[in-house]
């Protein structure tokens, strides 16, 4: 039973990541990669807007009963996000957060509402 629930959560996550990707592409961003895993954390989507790498966290909540999707991005998650982005930049481009043009966006889905896009979330 637990394995089925996990697969369902994974497939739901993949579904919302695909929706976020399509939404961002309609808004002019170019897709680079998805689900980049590192020991320090994971990157849901990596996009590009002009010369800027955009690291996107995709969040989904059926309701905000236990807090909104955006509120679920706590300090610990933010640090993992930064660490994973730094690792990706180094391994793929021999750059770092200090040398690359980059930003951190959120695309949040709440219930049946349209996606909420927050550019430069860590701004």
From Swiss-Prot:
InterPro entries in the cross-refs: Restrct_endonuc-II-like (IPR011335), tRNA_endonuc-like_dom_sf (IPR011856), UPF0102_YraN-like (IPR003509)
Record-linked Gene3D superfamilies: 3.40.1350.10
GO molecular function: nucleic acid binding
Superkingdom per UniProt: Bacteria
SS bond list: none
Similarity section: Belongs to the UPF0102 family.
PANTHER family named in the record: UPF0102 PROTEIN YRAN
Protein name, per record: UPF0102 protein APJL_1381
Taxonomic lineage of the native organism: Bacteria, Pseudomonadati, Pseudomonadota, Gammaproteobacteria, Pasteurellales
